[in-house]
Structures are given as C-alpha cells and as structure tokens.
C-alpha cells in the first residue's frame, strides 16, 4: 500500500516551479521536496490549505492511494 504524491504533475500543468510554490506558501524548497518525494511523515492541514489555494486544486488531486500488487 502506498500513498502517491502528485505535486510534480500539478506543478507541470500549472507551469509552476517547486521554488515558486515553496515561496508562495512560505515553505522551504527542501521541505517541499521532502513532501513531493513522499518522505514526509506528516503534513499540516495549514500546509495543505496553502498548497490547494495556490494550485487551485483539491487535496485528493495531490495524494492518491495505490494498493500493492
């Protein structure tokens, strides 16, 4: 079972860089990278709100659940 983080896809669709998003939401690029690679242990609701606001998306567009085969 895995949670897949689709931030790269959303950023590409919006022609936005990770650095630009990080700056807009007040997060370091390093911490955003940890989130993008799925290495984050937790995500604050306030961070999700900021990402969704800037990317004009829903939380379910950022994360998806994939079962192991």
PLM region descriptions:
Residues 16-34:
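Short alpha-helical DNA-recognition segment
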């Amino acid at each position: 079972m895995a949670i897949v983080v689709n931030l790269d896809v959303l950023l590409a669709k919006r022609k936005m860089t990770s650095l630009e998003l990080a700056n807009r939401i007040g997060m370091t690029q390093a911490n955003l990278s940890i989130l993008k690679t799925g290495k984050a242990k937790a995500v604050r609701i306030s961070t999700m709100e900021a990402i969704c606001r800037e990317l004009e998306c829903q939380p379910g567009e950022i994360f998806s659940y994939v079962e192991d085969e």
